[in-house]
Regions:
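Conserved, structured core segments of small domains
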Residues: 1-98
Length: 98
């Protein structure tokens, strides 16, 4: 199962705390990319945030990835389940069958 996660640092986080946690988060995501749990990761320019796509087998794994992020308590996130265009098209065609 793939999920798009958009994560933004809360505005009230002191810059000193943010500066300490950010290198830990970089290392955390390096490890997730090596494990192939994170397929792609991008910084959101001018947003103090990032977006990434995770590929997990369970909601437990998704929860672990999010919960173990060093910036967990300092960020807000939106999580969206993803499907391929082909799967979406197939579902729509089935719905529209007479």
């Amino acid at each position: 199962m793939k999920f798009l996660i958009i994560q933004k640092v809360k505005r009230e986080v002191p810059i000193e705390k943010w500066a300490k946690l950010l290198p830990l988060q970089f290392k955390y995501f390096d490890n997730l990319e090596k494990e192939k749990a994170v397929e792609v990761y991008y910084h959101l320019i001018g947003q103090q945030g990032s977006m990434y796509i995770v590929n997990v087998d369970s909601d437990e794994k998704l929860s672990r990835i999010i919960g173990q992020d060093p910036m967990f308590f300092e960020s807000e996130r939106e999580i969206y389940p993803l499907t391929t265009r082909q799967t979406h098209e197939k579902q729509i065609r089935e719905l529209l069958k007479p």
